[in-house]
Amino acid sequence: MDTISGRKPDIEHWSKLSFFEQMANLYSEIGRTLKWKNKNNEEMAQKAFFRALDIFDVLIVCHTKKYDTLRELCRLRENFCESFMESDLDNLSVIDKDLSHYAYSLRIHK
């Protein structure tokens, strides 16, 4: 599987993670994208954006048999791409906040 950032994803590793762990990792990369966008560092924002897209793509592969999850991941990916390309920081913040619940939940249950 080719990736946008050039890194080779380990689909086997990602498929062993719980859904909460997967989403928490995605949240981290989206948070980095938002952070660099807010600091007007387009180069770093774009790198984080590409890494987030790679994570989205791996998660989509991991969830191809779970239609509802797959559909929501695809919608979220589309929304994330659109918000990034339009520099819609408000919507990127909403996406970041929505995904933060997975990271917080994961911390509580570990």
Go through the PLM ranges and name each one:
Residues 1-110:
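Surface-exposed peri-terminal alpha-helical interaction modules
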